[in-house]
Design a protein with these regions (language model features):
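N-terminal membrane topogenesis motif
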Residues: 1-23, 79, 83, 217-238, ...
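Short runs within selected transmembrane alpha-helices of multi-pass transporters and secretion channels
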Residues: 20, 62-63, 126-145, 153-161, ...
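Short membrane-interface helical motifs at transmembrane helix boundaries
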Residues: 98-116, 324-342
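Residue-level signature of transmembrane alpha-helical cores of multipass secondary-active transporters
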Residues: 13-17, 51, 92, 126-127, ...
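Interfacial/gating helices of multi-pass transporter permease domains
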Residues: 31-52, 180-188, 221-226, 230, ...
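Helix-loop interface residues and adjacent transmembrane-helix termini in multi-pass membrane transporters
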Residues: 34-37, 117, 146-147, 177, ...
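Helix-loop junctions and terminal segments of transmembrane helices
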Residues: 59-74, 274-301
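Membrane-water interface segments that mark the loop-to-transmembrane alpha-helix transition
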Residues: 63-108, 122, 305-325
């Protein structure tokens, strides 16, 4: 493990992550001020449906290219590196295009039957066109991560966020009087255009970069062997999360008698409180992505002592940092909710969820470690248990206790997942 390069990459990714999260938080504040809490609920549900197709489009290809590139570089096989990238790009283009067609064709049904209003149809159609760009750029980013080159990915993300913010601001000031459906479509159009810009940048950068002559295609089934467990985990996890997100406003409505209130409280939680809670986690997200090639490298060389050392240090850093962050939210949660969103509800949610911040952050790191160790099946098991239990508890408790019942469900499920991670042995 090259400690200097790993540290440099971690610093670069962390700085990029902080900028992106700060910009993203600013963007959410802007959108929340325009759409309101109920509108944020519909905005969150729109992206819940969209994320289902994002998962279908990505299908673990980015993880596959990262692991294959890291493995072949460790074994000094440059032709195999180029072949792995080509094969994964082909898969990414096919999957992204297929997911785009499915979402575009089914947007009317999904908006009316799943979200509950046809006002979201145009937004879903607009988001569909971002899927091919997203899958290809994700594959290219995974390639560079496998090479321990994080700079291209960082630049593309900064460029993407800058374009997104500029276009959302333009939409807010130009189509504010066009009605909710038009406003929502204009806001998500920024997402589609920014994904296209990011993909174009990465494609040009990769094209201009010398890669040598010759390419050896990866062994038959090698991409599927890595991607399918990751994809299966994400398919199931996303399907369960989609069910959970659709169920929450309905369950709150049964408690309060108002679906509008259910949407408003759901929007406050998923669209405001949770993004703010994960704002400081930029370093951990950077660490998680960098751990995949590092752990893949050491395990490919059967250097289990180095692997265990990486895992132990990653977990120690995660626990230390997350406990401090949780303390800040516990003390200043209500103030932060008032400052950013002028909402007492958001402040209450931050305060309640602050003690489980270490458990939520730990899940991020564990995911990267397990992918690097080729133990995606464990991630699938943990996610399945967690999401299934949450859905059952939501159906049982939220109709009787409202949003406070769901916050209790979140606390319980995160503690359960953390206990499963704690019992895992590398």
């Amino acid at each position: 493990m090259n400690h200097k390069k790993f540290f440099q990459n971690a610093v670069l990714l962390t700085a990029t992550g902080l900028i992106l999260r700060a910009a993203g938080l600013l963007l959410r504040v802007l959108i929340a001020n325009v759409l309101g809490e109920e509108g944020m609920g519909l905005y969150s549900l729109t992206f819940t449906v969209y994320n289902l197709f994002v998962t279908l489009a990505q299908s673990g290809i980015a993880v596959a290219v990262t692991r294959l590139v890291a493995k072949h570089l460790a074994l000094k096989q440059p032709a195999e590196v180029k072949g792995a990238l080509r094969a994964c790009l082909l898969w990414a283009a096919v999957l992204g295009g297929g997911a785009c067609l499915l979402l575009f064709a089914g947007s009317g049904f999904l908006a009316g039957r799943w979200i509950g209003t046809p006002d979201c149809t145009l937004a879903l159609k607009t988001l569909a066109f971002s899927l091919p760009f997203m899958t290809v750029s994700g594959c290219l980013s995974g390639y560079f991560v496998g090479r321990r080159e994080v700079k291209p990915g960082c630049i593309s993300q900064l460029l993407e966020q800058a374009v997104r913010i500029a276009l959302v601001a333009l939409a807010v000031f130009t189509v504010r009087d066009g009605g909710f459906a038009v406003m929502l479509a204009a806001i998500v159009a920024a997402n589609t255009v920014s994904e296209g810009v990011s993909c174009l940048y990465l494609a040009i950068y990769c094209r201009l970069r010398p890669m040598g002559r010759g390419a050896v295609s990866p062994p038959r089934g090698s991409i599927r062997r890595i991607a399918l467990p990751v994809a299966a985990s994400r398919y199931l996890s996303t399907a369960l999360h989609t069910t959970e997100n659709m169920l929450i406003p309905l369950a709150i409505a049964r408690y309060s008698g108002s679906y509008s209130l259910g949407l408003a409280q759901f929007g406050a939680l998923k669209g405001m409180a949770i993004p703010l809670l994960f704002f400081p986690a930029s370093f951990l997200n950077a660490l998680s992505s960098l751990l995949v090639p590092e752990v893949t490298d050491t395990s490919a060389r059967a250097d289990w002592k180095a692997t265990r050392s990486i895992v132990e240090r990653a977990l120690t850093v995660t626990v230390t940092l997350s406990v401090m962050i949780g303390g800040v939210f516990l003390i200043y949660g209500r103030l932060l909710g008032a400052v950013f969103f002028q909402s007492e509800t958001v402040g209450m949610m931050l305060t309640v969820l602050a003690p489980i911040t270490p458990f939520m952050y730990m899940d991020t790191i564990a995911d990267g470690l397990l992918k690097g160790l080729d133990r995606q099946a464990k991630t699938l098991r943990n996610n399945t248990i967690d999401s299934t239990l949450r859905i059952i508890l939501i159906a049982v408790t939220v109709p009787f206790f409202g949003i406070k019942g769901f916050l209790g469900v979140m606390v319980f499920s995160n503690v359960l997942v953390a206990s499963q991670i704690g019992r895992a042995h590398v």
